[in-house]
Design a protein with these regions (language model features):
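A contiguous, low-structure linker/loop signature
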Residues: 61-115, 122
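A short beta-strand motif that forms the metal-chelation/ATP-contact edge
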Residues: 172-178, 217-221, 363-369
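Short beta-strand
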Residues: 52-55, 161-167, 207-211
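C-terminal accessory nucleic-acid interaction domains of nucleic acid-metabolism proteins
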Residues: 1-27, 31, 42, 46, ...
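Signature for HUH/AEP ssDNA processing cores
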Residues: 94-166, 177-185, 303-307
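A short linear hydrophobic-aromatic micro-motif
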Residues: 158-163, 204-206, 348-354
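Acidic/polar low-complexity segments and flexible, solvent-exposed patches
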Residues: 296-399
């Protein structure tokens, strides 16, 4: 199957392949969806380099991450070389238009993961991103509450805030910014937002860096780091839900499950793109950087943490599993709980720390347990891991 888009030929292979087994949606359904929401979807990635997150065997299997553009690609597919903090470089695909977008979808990309910079200026982000990440047990109403406070903080400091569901458990708040500041400065501004949100809503929001110390909704500012990407507006997530741009008037009553591959087609036809004016509303970071200066260093961690040696957790953590898949890791957790039933009964939802870790080309899952609710004499020690997958080819024991 081939599509002609603005004079470019996009070949679609295996259009009838089922990508979402639960709903039965195929690759062609995914292609058709992105064509309908093209204006909004392209706006979310236009002129940006992207990391290719490829589900070549469907969303029920693990994706692999591909920074480098495929060697075999149409001559019209553009690339740009990015440098990473590790010192490595990669020529990444730049999405310019719908043809580029659909070409990446044909590779097995379900969601789109752009960097916060444009290809013509890779050192100065034009987007500030806040990712609201709830700990287990936190309700959607609390996430919405934190999102509204994040909006207030951004707008009080001269930026227009743009909300969207994440397509998963969380929520995203974006702001277009003038591309005049470095990654470090943008991250510092985002951290200032997080700390101010936490100050206003200490019972609900947290900006604490270490996962085991968090409660409520983590206002994640680190998505503004140079090597981080976030699923873009209108991205279909592996859950089958969509990262849906919203108007702020919709946020209090929204539910993530309302925005699916099917329902978004009707929504887009009826309401268009709530983010249509985003590119014309770029603002300055000066006020947020002044806020960061006034806040001073974080009291809960040193300004310049040591680069050598392992951090000693302040919470009583034990590591349970490192697995290639989440299912394997969760099965290991259940075996551990069966061996320690009295301990398992005392655990709160937020005490089970499930981390999706990014390896060289794929994700893997780490599970740790915080024993803070277990009396000290009854806490089991660190045991051999239930699953001991080593994504890097070296031993890294301990929590």
């Amino acid at each position: 199957m081939t599509l002609e888009l603005d004079g470019r030929i996009v070949k679609i292979t295996n259009p009838d392949r089922v990508v979402f087994p639960r709903s039965g949606h195929t690759k062609l359904d995914l292609i058709s969806y992105y064509r309908v929401v093209a204006e909004g979807a392209v706006r979310g990635v236009a002129d940006r380099p992207v990391i290719l997150k490829r589900f070549v065997h469907g969303v029920d299997r693990e994706a692999f991450f591909q920074k480098r553009a495929p060697a075999k690609r149409p001559e019209w597919v553009e690339v740009v070389e990015l440098s990473y903090p590790s010192g490595r470089t990669a020529e990444e695909v730049v999405i310019r238009d719908l043809a580029h977008l659909l070409w990446t979808v044909n590779l097995g990309c379900v969601d789109l993961n752009p960097h916060p910079v444009r290809a013509h200026d890779l050192d100065h982000p034009d987007e500030l991103r806040i990712d609201l990440d709830p700990v287990p047990g936190v309700g959607w109403e609390q996430i919405v509450r934190v999102a509204l406070v994040a909006r207030d903080v951004l707008e009080e400091h001269g930026l227009t805030a743009w909300p969207k569901t994440s397509g998963s458990r969380g929520f995203h708040v974006y702001a277009r910014i003038e591309p005049r500041w470095t990654f470090r400065e943008v991250r510092r501004a985002a951290e200032a937002v997080a700390r101010e949100v936490e100050r206003r809503e200490p019972d609900v929001a947290t900006s604490r860096w270490w996962k085991e110390e968090r409660q409520g909704v983590f206002v994640d500012y680190n998505q503004n780091a140079r090597d981080h990407t976030v699923a873009s507006a209108y991205s279909v997530r592996p859950t089958g839900l969509v990262s849906a741009p919203l108007a702020w008037s919709e946020v209090p009553g929204c539910r993530p499950e309302d925005f699916t591959l099917a329902s978004m087609l009707d929504r887009y036809a009826e309401t268009g793109d709530p983010w249509a004016g985003m590119d014309e509303r770029a603002g300055s970071l000066e006020a947020l950087l002044e806020l960061a200066e006034a806040q001073g260093p974080r009291p809960d961690r040193p300004a310049a943490p040591p680069r050598q040696g392992r951090r000693q957790p302040v919470m009583p953590l034990v590591e349970i599993a490192r697995a290639a898949t989440r299912d394997e890791a969760m099965a290991g957790l259940e075996r551990w709980k069966a061996r320690h039933p009295e301990v398992a009964r005392l655990l709160q939802p937020a005490d089970v720390l499930v981390d999706s870790m990014r390896g060289r080309s794929s994700t893997w899952t780490r599970i740790r347990v915080n024993l803070r609710h277990v009396p000290e004499p009854d806490r089991p020690g660190q045991e051999p891991l239930e699953v001991d997958y080593d994504p890097y080819g070296r031993d890294q024991p301990g929590p």
